[in-house]
Amino acid sequence: MRRRQLLQRLMAGVMLATGLHLPAFASIEVAGVKFDDSVTVAGKELKLNGAGLRTKVIFKVYAAGLYLAEKKTTVPDVLTTSGPRRVSITMLREVSSDEFGKSFMEGLSSNTDKVERTRILPQTMKFGEVFAQIQTLKKGDQMLLDWIPGEGTQCYLNGKKLGDLMPDVAFYNAVLRIWLGDKPVDSSLKPALLGER
């Protein structure tokens, strides 16, 4: 394993030195969290589009990765892509579910208009019930937010399914805009998820 990492770093160094670029889809590490270059959601292979770090003030809160069927570099392309999608979040510090939920709602409100918020209100309330089941998100906890076409949004915590499916794609896209919208919760995370870093 160590030899493989050394070889990957050596190859990356050679590629940088010679002006070559790493492939668009490659596994990366963010703050000690490894994001695989591909995952399977609803029987479809998704590739890592980008990954980055969510910070608040000076604290590293979580590492997040976005998985899509093919590379997308603009927000409209990400939001209109067909097929499954995944956001993977790994906590880097302990956060109460109240604090995480509040940040989630602020991000949602900042990046949706009143009509959208009204449309997705029932699903937003369901999602709130999911957070009510969790006292604390601990360092190392992994949350997955999957969009499964024809079914809906499914949330997992450490591999365990949480809550019911939320069927409207508008809800999933509103969740994505927490990180990719005009007022993202972390301005440096947005370009990272779009693969710009």
Residue positions per predicted region:
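Mid-length scaffold segments of soluble, non-membrane domains
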Residues: 72-150
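Sec/Tat signal peptide C-region and signal peptidase I cleavage site
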Residues: 22-26
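N-terminal structural module
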Residues: 27-81
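Cysteine/selenocysteine-centered motifs that mediate thiol-based redox chemistry or coordinate metal-sulfur cofactors
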Residues: 187-197
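Short strand-turn-strand beta-turns centered on an Asx-Gly dipeptide
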Residues: 157-159
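Flexible glycine-rich active-site/ligand-binding loops centered on an Asp-His dyad
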Residues: 162-189
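Bacterial N-terminal signal peptides
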Residues: 11-21
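N-terminal export leaders
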Residues: 3-11
